[in-house]
């Protein structure tokens, strides 16, 4: 109690270095009205807790479920409300570019899809074997898989800071999105190349779809979401991509005389290079491994991986357009 009869109390304040100090918090101005003073103190503490929840953290302050990359040292969000996580899309933290690279990619692919729907309305033409009447559904399956992957990735990176339960769930959806994108990428080339021999496109598409389902089931095992299985996850995705070597070799033999063969092959090789290089950054965690803390918000491996995934998808889109144009003019 001070000389004016006010009640002063000691309040414990947490310090960043783990030590705690006490400071004097003046009592109320109502002659010892404990109820009013207590309410103000509770309100102040609530506001402090709210602000603390929205503060960016360092790696060592994170809960265990969010510790994924020890070379990114700062600017983390953790245990944020859904509302705060949503509005963090407009702030600058270490997930900002992860969100925006694939969110912009999703919007771009939506625009491409709408443009193609407006330009071509023949999803299931009556005579798919006649030139100019080629079915479009395999092409739109690829676009749908790409959009799902990009959107799932953006949502995962935006809301994974909410809770452990949501984090695990969104990681699974993210893995499912990557798998879906790989599976659906096979649909346009395999379908249009082997359209005149349906048994082959059925065999190849059934094969990659089965591999994808197995991959999703495997990755839905909670323990495989841990950082130590990063290389294993990448290996699963790479094995799905390498499956394409078999139908690609078959396609080269079947369409050796196709004048668009070389251009299409270049686009597909570019896609493979983009995906492999991006995966290399993702697994190696370069460049942040070389300079921890330097690339926390801009330029770390996952952001680079996202850019290469988007470039690979666009390269494959260009190849798919060539396949469509070829079948539109050639037919069976």
Swiss-Prot record:
It is a multi-pass membrane protein. Belongs to the ADIPOR family. This is Heptahelical transmembrane protein 1. May act as a negative regulator of abscisic acid (ABA)-mediated osmotic stress signaling and function in cross-talk between cold and osmotic signaling. The chain crosses the membrane at residues 99-119, 139-159, 173-193, 200-220, 234-254, 263-283, 304-324. GO terms for biological process: negative regulation of abscisic acid-activated signaling pathway; response to hormone; response to salt stress; response to sucrose. Expressed in roots, hypocotyls, vasculature of cotyledons and leaves, hydathodes and guard cells. In reproductive organs, expressed in trichomes, veins of sepals, stamens and stigmata of pistils. Residues 26-37 have a biased composition (Basic and acidic residues). It is found in: Membrane. InterPro entries: AdipoR/HlyIII-related. It comes from Arabidopsis thaliana. The lineage of its organism: Eukaryota, Viridiplantae, Streptophyta, Embryophyta, Tracheophyta. Induction: By abscisic acid (ABA), salt, osmotic and drought stresses. One of its GO terms (cellular component) is membrane. Disruption phenotype: Reduced apical meristem dominance and length of hypocotyl, and increased cotyledon curling. Mutant plants are hypersensitive to ABA and osmotic stress.
